Amino acid sequence: MTVQIRPPVLSQEDCVFRANLRKKLNIESYLQDRTAFCVGEKAIHCELYEFSPDAPTIVFLPGIGTYCELYAELLSGLSKKGFNVVGIDPLGHGYSAGSRGDYTVEQMCDAVSEVLDVLQQRFEGPFGIYGYSIGALLAMAAAEQDDRLSAVLCGTLLVPDIAPDMGYRMGWNWTWASSLMMPTYKVPLKNFVDFEQLLKGHPAAQEINNDPLIVFDYPLRTLSSLFNYRCNIVSKKFDFSSAILHGDQDEVLPLSYSRRVMSYCDQPLELLVVDNEGHMVPLMKPKLIVEMAAQWFEKQFSKEMADAVL
């Protein structure tokens, strides 16, 4: 099946706010390295940072509410380490088409597979995926469904089978029940993520909190799909390698939660601890994450390519 590729819809190129946000993020030079395009009938927005056709390829899924342009320094830096890097704006997020914030985990898995169909026409592989925050859950779900993904790096992995505490579990149950009656009712993101506090001290904090491309309100059916998804890694070992990248000062989920996830899941998970850093480290310290992610992916891809030769 041929997947349609179209030019991107970069809707804010002449916007003063967009220019100011990029300046505060200091990403103007990194954006010169990207090639943007849309994939499929759902117009999935992708941003490619190419290294070479025979280099390994990493797909990136951003954190909740956000989109991949905000992570340009991270994606460009990772590419310069020897990888083709492709950021995907989730359906209804950033520059991707669709009702704002509206997707299911299954739809995102399909979107990742469509993008892989396109990438395979240009790049030899191997292919890995890096998901940050809620993007980590989506990355893991995508790898469970698509065996082309041989390495999965999760920036703080939420596994809904394992609630951090009873308050989370009650909230998820409420979300599920409410979504049956009011699936399109939107819940403010600030009810469970305080961007202003998490980005405290970042030069672009105010701009990010006012960015029209960020999703600040989520339909209940999206939240229900995310927080009630059942990860297959809980009861099954997959062929892909996997790791959790977690700051020891994480304000959203404590480091102890990742240790619980590792002991609960049948899937082997490596833990990479980011010392003295919190949840927003990919935006706050992108160069640090570039080094850690590049080292891990290089190790996994090298093993895979060595095994392929034997």
Roles of regions detected by a PLM:
Residues G65-Y67, G94-F123:
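Catalytic nucleophile-loop/oxyanion-hole region of alpha/beta-hydrolase
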Residues A55, G63-T66, D248:
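Active-site glycine-rich loops that stabilize anionic/oxyanionic intermediates
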